[in-house]
Structures are given as structure tokens and as C-alpha cells.
Amino acid sequence: MYKRQVHYKFALQNKGLGNSVIKGVTEVINRYGKAIVLEDDLILAPNFLFFMNQGLDKYKEETSVFSICGYSNKVKVPKDYSYDTYFCTRSSSWGWATWADRWNSVDWELENFDKYHILKKEFNRWGGSDCWKMLNDWKCGRNKSWAIRFCFAQFLQKKVSLFPVTSKVQNDGFDGKGTNCKRWSRFHCIFDNSAKKEFTYPENVSIHPSLFRSAIGYHSIIKRIFSRIMYFVYRF
């Protein structure tokens, strides 16, 4: 049995989503050198911690890997693809992990924001058609997202994230009550209920073109329009 300690820390006032995550993760990650971060509306696979910790150990010194993600879209896996994992550009904030050096490389303020406008199209090709809008909305005060700033740092540094082929996380927040989640979602996944504890990884840290298209396709304009229509259908 592992010995565990639970530490609680309460804020005297609501700091907001972005500030709370940034300050909380910074405190933990600077103490332990790495962190696994969860939200309270996530359902975890039985092997979630095995997957996350193995990824953290395996890619600790591989700085081209920016994060380990527990959630995965329902990707179309090629028949000749034999690994349990794949690399993709855009990180996921639904059950994820990273290391202190990568976390502390993020520019959270982006004070010289105007110089990044020329990267709008490239950023969207890299991570999906909604990337620049979310980043610009944050800058304009229309959202408090820390995650899009994390993704932008990853984009600027040309780094990747590790994902499971079968998701180790399921988001249970699509009841319309969550801050950023609606009742219907295109992100329902194939959830791993297996007892598998050892995972296989690609030999090289590189993007598989087919898996990339399948994963990033969830953020395409067509998918987003369809999702918006379905959201309105499910409202009534």
C-alpha cells in the first residue's frame, strides 16, 4: 500500500478559473517537479494513474513533449498502428500532467499580444479552427481560460502532447451546469475500462498524419457548426 497525504488549501475569495489553476498548479509543480491535474467532473479509468505516471517518467527528459493527456477524442486508428499512445499538437485540459520546466516556460500575460496576430492562421492549422478565437477572447476579457494560453505556448515552442488511443478520462460535465461545457458535446469518447497497466509508445516523438487529422478534426469549422446545432436541439 502506498502512503498518501491529502493537503487542502482554501482561498478566501473566488480567484476565477484561470488564476486559480495557474497559481495552484505553479505552487504544486514547483514543489514536486511535476503535477497531475484534474477537475471535479471527470470520470477516470481504472488505469488512469498508471498511464499518467508512466508518461511522466518516460518523457521527463524529452522536452519536446509538453504534456501528458488522459482524455482523447474518438480517433480513427489505422489498422497498422499498434501503439497504445499517439502524439498530437493541441493539449487537452481534461485530466492532464506536465513538468515544472515546461509549465514555467509559459508566458501567461502575453503583454506584446499584437505581434502574434500574424500567427492566427498557423495557430488554427496547428490546433483547430477555434484556437485563435479562444486566445483572442481571453485577451479581450471574454473568457478566463488558462488552457488556451498553455496551448499557445506549446504552439510557439513547437512541442507535442502524448495521448492515449483509448481515453482514460470521461467528462461528466455536459449537463449544462459547467462553466465551459454544454449539455450536448462532440467530445464523448471511447472510455477505457480495462485493467491494462503497461502501455506501448511510438519509437519516435513525432506526429502521425492520420491520427493528427482525426484528432484535430474535432475542432474543424464543420464539426463546430454541427455541434452548435445539436446544442440548440438538446436545449428543448
Q: Across the structure, where does each feature detected by a protein language model lie?
A:
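An acidic/histidine-cluster motif and surrounding catalytic segment
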Residues: K3-V37, L42-F236
